[in-house]
Amino acid sequence: MKIFICEDDPKQRENMVTIIKNYIMIEEKPMEIALATDNPYEVLEQAKNMNDIGCYFLDIQLSTDINGIKLGSEIRKHDPVGNIIFVTSHSELTYLTFVYKVAAMDFIFKDDPAELRTRIIDCLETAHTRLQLLSKDNSVETIELKRGSNSVYVQYDDIMFFESSTKSHRLIAHLDNRQIEFYGNLKELSQLDDRFFRCHNSFVVNRHNIESIDSKERIVYFKNKEHCYASVRNVKKI
């Protein structure tokens, strides 16, 4: 899940980035901060190009010609089930969300740092749970990666390729911005759907995320700049 932050106070914006990055790293959630900016139009442009569900943390009072609530209303046109969270120091402005019919997940008051951190994490947990529920309805395709006592849910679109691990019965999922080791086997993963193809004894690739293929060297390059290898027999089948 991609996370967007629109906050015109640089210190506050950096604080939110730190809170979210630490949460993602510690909890190993399939999330990333796609954009942190003071420009609402940059966020809106990203929302227009979204092909999955986003999570948006928006300051209500921005130093531009568009406020956070109006931005949320515009985002709704392109990401109707996205998670919109307003961050503000002005509780009296929350009524505007009903005027604009934004359907916000939460309002976080940023004057209390401890409360800010707790509420941001609560929102991320809720957004993650919603994503899992939507995936059960086939709205978003995800896979459960089992890591012993816990699991991580990852969207198909975030997967570059799977690789066999040096550890027995384990694989490594190469995602857009990180790697996850989990229990599984490549044969099952190659049968998820047509986009996943076993190009080598050690690799299953996501065809949708391939940038290019060097057929001579049998190297597959991905959108995140990683690469893997293909066998002589399978390189032309990718």
Curated annotation (Swiss-Prot):
Q: Which InterPro entries match?
A: CheY-like_superfamily (IPR011006), LytR-like (IPR046947), LytTR_DNA-bd_dom (IPR007492), Sig_transdc_resp-reg_receiver (IPR001789)
The record's section on PANTHER family has: STAGE 0 SPORULATION PROTEIN A HOMOLOG (PTHR37299:SF3), TRANSCRIPTIONAL REGULATOR-RELATED (PTHR37299)
Where do the HTH LytTR-type domain residues begin and end?
143-238
What protein does this entry describe?
Accessory gene regulator protein A
* Primary location: cytoplasm
Q: What SMART domains does the annotation carry?
A: LytTR, REC
* Keyword terms, alphabetized: Activator, Cytoplasm, DNA-binding, Phosphoprotein, Transcription, Transcription regulation, Two-component regulatory system
**Where is it located?**
Cytoplasm
In terms of Pfam families, this protein maps to: LytTR (PF04397), Response_reg (PF00072)
Function statement:
Required for high-level post-exponential phase expression of a series of secreted proteins.
Give the Response regulatory domain ranges.
2-125
- Positions bearing 4-aspartylphosphate: D59
A GO CC term assigned to this protein in UniProt = cytoplasm
Gene Ontology molecular function: any one? DNA binding
Classification via CDD domains? REC_LytTR_AgrA-like
